[in-house]
Structures are given as structure tokens and as C-alpha cells.
Amino acid sequence: MPKHEFSVDMTCEGCSNAVSRVLNKLGGVEFDIDLPNKKVCINSEHSVDILLETLEKTGKAVSYLGPK
């Protein structure tokens, strides 16, 4: 399964919970959230566009850092 790394503007536990919520709702993903470094690593067959769109539902600034 491809692994992708994203930067997400998370400042607190609530922010990371929002990321977890939208990714779990999408399904078909395994992910690790690195709150101090504001990064999310996602293992998924979904396209980068779908993952970006999903992460943007949190209302946070999101950018794709590349394959991990």
C-alpha cells in the first residue's frame, strides 16, 4: 500500500482528533499522526487528491509532502 506524508496545521489534540475522524470516515486507510511536527503519514490505495480533499475537511491548512 502506498504511503504518503502530509503537513497539516494542527496545534492541539482536538486538531489531531479531527484528522482521525475524517480519515476513519473515509476508510481504507492506516495513518500515524505526528502532532509536534504537524505531519500525517497515511498508508492508502486512495489517490493523493482524495486524501488531500479529505484532510481539508478539517478546515486546517494541508499540503502534500510526498511519498514516504
Curated annotation (Swiss-Prot):
<dbReference type="InterPro" id="IPR036163">
    <property type="entry name" value="HMA_dom_sf"/>
</dbReference>
<feature type="binding site">
    <location>
        <position position="15"/>
    </location>
    <ligand>
        <name>Cu cation</name>
    </ligand>
</feature>
<dbReference type="GO" id="GO:0006825">
    <property type="term" value="P:copper ion transport"/>
</dbReference>
<dbReference type="InterPro" id="IPR006121">
    <property type="entry name" value="HMA_dom"/>
</dbReference>
<comment type="subunit">
    <text>Homodimer. Interacts with ATP7B. Interacts with ATP7A. Interacts (via dimer form) with SLC31A1 (via C-terminal domain); this interaction improves ATOX1 stability and controls intracellular Cu(I) levels.</text>
</comment>
<protein>
    <recommendedName>
        <fullName>Copper transport protein ATOX1</fullName>
    </recommendedName>
</protein>
<dbReference type="GO" id="GO:0016531">
    <property type="term" value="F:copper chaperone activity"/>
</dbReference>
<dbReference type="InterPro" id="IPR051881">
    <property type="entry name" value="Copper_transport_ATOX1-like"/>
</dbReference>
<comment type="similarity">
    <text>Belongs to the ATX1 family.</text>
</comment>
<dbReference type="GO" id="GO:0005829">
    <property type="term" value="C:cytosol"/>
</dbReference>
<feature type="binding site">
    <location>
        <position position="12"/>
    </location>
    <ligand>
        <name>Cu cation</name>
    </ligand>
</feature>
<feature type="modified residue" description="N6-acetyllysine">
    <location>
        <position position="60"/>
    </location>
</feature>
<dbReference type="Pfam" id="PF00403">
    <property type="entry name" value="HMA"/>
</dbReference>
<feature type="modified residue" description="Phosphoserine">
    <location>
        <position position="47"/>
    </location>
</feature>
<keyword id="KW-0406">Ion transport</keyword>
<keyword id="KW-0813">Transport</keyword>
<comment type="function">
    <text>Binds and deliver cytosolic copper to the copper ATPase proteins. May be important in cellular antioxidant defense.</text>
</comment>
<keyword id="KW-0479">Metal-binding</keyword>
<dbReference type="GO" id="GO:0046872">
    <property type="term" value="F:metal ion binding"/>
</dbReference>
<dbReference type="InterPro" id="IPR017969">
    <property type="entry name" value="Heavy-metal-associated_CS"/>
</dbReference>
<keyword id="KW-0187">Copper transport</keyword>
<keyword id="KW-0007">Acetylation</keyword>
<feature type="domain" description="HMA">
    <location>
        <begin position="1"/>
        <end position="63"/>
    </location>
</feature>
<keyword id="KW-0186">Copper</keyword>
<keyword id="KW-0597">Phosphoprotein</keyword>
<keyword id="KW-0143">Chaperone</keyword>
